[in-house]
Amino acid sequence: MTTLSCKVTSVEAITDTVYRVRLVPDAAFSFRAGQYLMVVMDERDKRPFSMASTPDEKGFIELHIGASELNLYAMAVMDRILKDREIVVDIPHGDAWLRDDEERPLILIAGGTGFSYVRSILLTALARNPARDVTIYWGGREEKHLYDLSELEALSVNHPNLRIEPVVEQPEEGWRGRTGTVLTAVLQDYGTLAGHDIYIAGRFEMAKIARDLFCHERNAREDRLFGDAFAFI
């Protein structure tokens, strides 16, 4: 574990509640795709955020932070970032990193800013094996919550093996993607998940339901199901 002081080089408000933050650490760092860091608020208060950048991007760390009056836990971190333009982080954390088996097809599942977790995995997996079959299911309450959908669609142009499945719970008129939940979409698309590696970013309750459904109804291998939540449930 490494403790780093990081300068905040940019803060972009992607939506009214999501911020893209870039940090430049004061020393060398390393991590695996899918790991997270802890923002050190004080000695006893450390707050986890997935790294959206990849291990190959050595000069900076990118975070996607969902912060609003409904999420004061993250809002306090954003307040410090905006005020001090510098934060201290512990890096790396988490065991739900991208495994080295480059042949098994991937299913990446995220809700909201959980996309930061699967983004690092997606970009790293395609860099290692550009022909690997990858499907990403990204869910949000509204279309605006899928804030980097255009980046994904551009990536799929150069990777025909990459399938993007955006899922919205409350679609507006003209929405062309899926409606409902990401877990329902996965179950609709696959009769079996036995041959897939599955990475999930979401709340504990969502991860538990996914594990139960995928393993019991679609024969997913529990040892090929990855997500930070599984360390706690």
Curated annotation (Swiss-Prot):
User: Belongs to which family?
Assistant: Belongs to the Fre/LuxG FAD/NAD(P) flavoprotein oxidoreductase family.
Q: What is its EC number?
A: 1.5.1.41
Which positions does UniProt annotate for pyridine binding? G111, G112, T113, G114, F115
Q: What is this protein called?
A: NAD(P)H-flavin reductase
Q: Name one GO molecular function term.
A: riboflavin reductase (NADPH) activity
Q: What does this protein do?
A: Catalyzes the reduction of soluble flavins by reduced pyridine nucleotides.
Alphabetically list the UniProt keywords: FAD, Flavoprotein, FMN, Ion transport, Iron, Iron transport, NAD, NADP, Oxidoreductase, Transport
Look up and give the organism this protein is from.
Answer: Salmonella typhimurium (strain LT2 / SGSC1412 / ATCC 700720)
Reactions catalysed, semicolon-separated, are: reduced riboflavin + NADP(+) = riboflavin + NADPH + 2 H(+); reduced riboflavin + NAD(+) = riboflavin + NADH + 2 H(+)
Which terms under GO biological process does the entry name?
iron ion transport
